[in-house]
Amino acid sequence: MKTVVFAYHDMGCLGIEALLSAGYEISAIFTHTDNPGEKAFYGSVARLAAERGIPVYAPDNVNHPLWMERIAQLSPEVIFSFYYRHLICDEILQLAPRGAFNLHGSLLPKYRGRAPLNWVLVNGETETGVTLHRMVKRADAGAIVAQLRVAIAPDDIAITLHHKLCHAARQLLEQTLPAIKHGNILEIAQRENEATCFGRRTPDDSFLEWHKPASVLHNMVRAVADPWPGAFSYVGNQKFTVWSSRVHPHASKAQPGSVISVAPLLIACGDGALEIVTGQAGDGITMQGSQLAQTLGLVQGSRLNSQPACAARRRTRVLILGVNGFIGNHLTERLLREDHYEVYGLDIGSDAISRFMNHPHFHFVEGDISIHSEWIEYHVKKCDVVLPLVAIATPIEYTRNPLRVFELDFEENLRIIRYCVKYRKRIIFPSTSEVYGMCSDKYFDEDHSNLIVGPVNKPRWIYSVSKQLLDRVIWAYGEKEGLQFTLFRPFNWMGPRLDNLNAARIGSSRAITQLILNLVEGSPIKLIDGGKQKRCFTDIRDGIEALYRIIENAGNRCDGEIINIGNPENEASIEELGEMLLASFEKHPLRHYFPPFAGFRVVESSSYYGKGYQDVEHRKPSIRNARRCLNWEPKIDMQETIDETLDFFLRTVDLTDKPS
């Protein structure tokens, strides 16, 4: 049976050997070039392929049409992936009539995603395994063909568990590959309600946070022990690595991070104490704990820290342009909740952020981004992270004021992007779900979905196209000039402080605010073209938590990424949104202050938005990038969001002259 193989690492080598032993004909192997910054303790797929006389390739993007065409010419009957690090597009998977199969290092549906070997140790699991599953468009989500369980011993570290998993994988493939070859397999669908997903780990993720329990820190040490980069901490600005450790149930009143003793080297934790058995100072040699203490100049009572002392003293400076807006004010609240951010903001108003004005780490200037260019350039240069959130983002304005939309949303933001390039500052740019336009995919995918808009004589697309072009400009600056960026695409975020009722009175607001105004004033709820258009509504708290994690950027996982932030489970039509809102309104304690419900009224989009409007029937996000990069899932049910949004707006209404 002819196959094309995607493989890397030891698992890739043993997968290839297993295929050859089972009588498969391997037409080509796709692998990766080795990362010079990664310790290569594993077998070389490229070398094995060369020794076996099999063509081998390592393209930067195997999903490029040219590579897709070359793979199609190979006419594979079946495709296998063994620890290949890039997602393979559905078009390639469909080339094999017998399907595509992937070997994953966990007991799916648990631990989907990257680095499951390390994550199970970090989380203190006592069992893991290997899974062979059918490949589908969503990573690690296809039906399970075979699994083999592997026990995790208390003394297992990453390398010993790796060897166990390789042994199990070899057994699994020996048992299963002949069955696939003869079409004699039983597939079991994964239970989505049991799925967990974890993102890529980097060396920077392995710092030891001493306020955590000793058992948690010991698991971290196990998870990244040599040949992985190791768990680390600091004495002042001196970094050191912990290669092995033991947990002590030591009852101590010492502050977490304090040295309890130096022989053995025992560190107080949030619960218990951690003995550093072996470690390494800087780029030095490995030594026992007591010698490490001497090398680092530690004595009883010394304090360790999770980051360099110089870094601990300086807060990250975040510049938010449009800080008074819906996202801006909620994000400010989230950042100021932590003690390591300094927020600088600019906006033309301050009503939503008045609650922060006396905060010592919040700095606000009232102004217009089209006028205060010198202030903006200075603060881009001064700050570490830039979020240009200023935009006209209400549909009626796209047809009412298309040139103003272009001038503000595109031209003013392009200038800010160029400042970030000039001063080499990280930009987190708000793209939009609107860029997908009339895409027909079931789930809108950041990396694969086409961006489809209407003709030029439909000005409603000027916002979508302005944002899309900025996305492309930012991407190009990242590729060609090293701009550090992340693009995030909100999908119908809603919650308190979304627009205001005055904006709704002139039609310049989002859907839920307009519907609330209709209820408050006793006017009919207008359903544009029947209100059958479906959207996925996302609670602002879920959205802001994802955005906060992008700013945190653990392990730089968000660099160069496009991330949808939405809740695919909260899909509803505008009509259904109106009905849910009405039900919440009718049982609200302030209901008696407002007029009777005036009913629903169907109106044509052209009469409401004006000439040149087109709508989109559905807009559902794929959130695999958010899961992978942020370890994020939306949690808040749509009804809860509706109730809280309605309550906020009803309590902003002056009730003094309303009937009781």
UniProtKB/Swiss-Prot annotation:
Marked site (Raises pKa of active site His) residue numbers: D140
Alphabetical list of Pfam families matching this protein: Epimerase (PF01370), Formyl_trans_C (PF02911), Formyl_trans_N (PF00551)
Region entry Formyltransferase ArnAFT, spans: 1-304
Function summary: Bifunctional enzyme that catalyzes the oxidative decarboxylation of UDP-glucuronic acid (UDP-GlcUA) to UDP-4-keto-arabinose (UDP-Ara4O) and the addition of a formyl group to UDP-4-amino-4-deoxy-L-arabinose (UDP-L-Ara4N) to form UDP-L-4-formamido-arabinose (UDP-L-Ara4FN). The modified arabinose is attached to lipid A and is required for resistance to polymyxin and cationic antimicrobial peptides.
Site positions for Transition state stabilizer: N102
Gene Ontology annotations of biological process type: lipid A biosynthetic process; lipopolysaccharide biosynthetic process; response to antibiotic
Region feature (Dehydrogenase ArnADH): 314-660
Protein's name in the database: Bifunctional polymyxin resistance protein ArnA
Active site feature: H104, E434, R619
Keyword Iron-sulfur in record: no
Family membership noted in the UniProt record: In the N-terminal section; belongs to the Fmt family. UDP-L-Ara4N formyltransferase subfamily.
CDD domains for the chain: Arna_FMT_C, Arna_like_SDR_e, FMT_core_ArnA_N
Residues where NAD(+) binds: D347, D368, I369
Residues that coordinate or bind (6R)-10-formyltetrahydrofolate: H86, L87, I88, R114, V136, K137, R138, A139, D140
UniProt catalytic activity: UDP-alpha-D-glucuronate + NAD(+) = UDP-beta-L-threo-pentopyranos-4-ulose + CO2 + NADH; UDP-4-amino-4-deoxy-beta-L-arabinose + (6R)-10-formyltetrahydrofolate = UDP-4-deoxy-4-formamido-beta-L-arabinose + (6S)-5,6,7,8-tetrahydrofolate + H(+)
Residue sites binding UDP-alpha-D-glucuronate per the record: 393, 398, 432-433, 460, 492, 526-535, 613
GO MF annotation list: carboxy-lyase activity; UDP-4-amino-4-deoxy-L-arabinose formyltransferase activity; UDP-glucuronate dehydrogenase activity
Natural source organism: Escherichia coli O81 (strain ED1a)
EC numbers for this chain: 2.1.2.13, 1.1.1.305
Listed InterPro entries: Arna-like_SDR_e, Bifun_polymyxin_resist_ArnA, Epimerase_deHydtase, Formyl_trans_C, Formyl_transf_N, Formyl_transf_N_sf, Formyl_transferase-like_C_sf, Lipid_A_modif_metabolic_enz
GO cellular component: membrane
UniProt keyword annotation of Cell cycle present: no
Subunit structure: Homohexamer, formed by a dimer of trimers.
Pathway in which the depicted protein is active: Nucleotide-sugar biosynthesis; UDP-4-deoxy-4-formamido-beta-L-arabinose biosynthesis; UDP-4-deoxy-4-formamido-beta-L-arabinose from UDP-alpha-D-glucuronate: step 1/3; Nucleotide-sugar biosynthesis; UDP-4-deoxy-4-formamido-beta-L-arabinose biosynthesis; UDP-4-deoxy-4-formamido-beta-L-arabinose from UDP-alpha-D-glucuronate: step 3/3; Bacterial outer membrane biogenesis; lipopolysaccharide biosynthesis
Keywords, ordered alphabetically: Antibiotic resistance, Lipid A biosynthesis, Lipid biosynthesis, Lipid metabolism, Lipopolysaccharide biosynthesis, Multifunctional enzyme, NAD, Oxidoreductase, Transferase
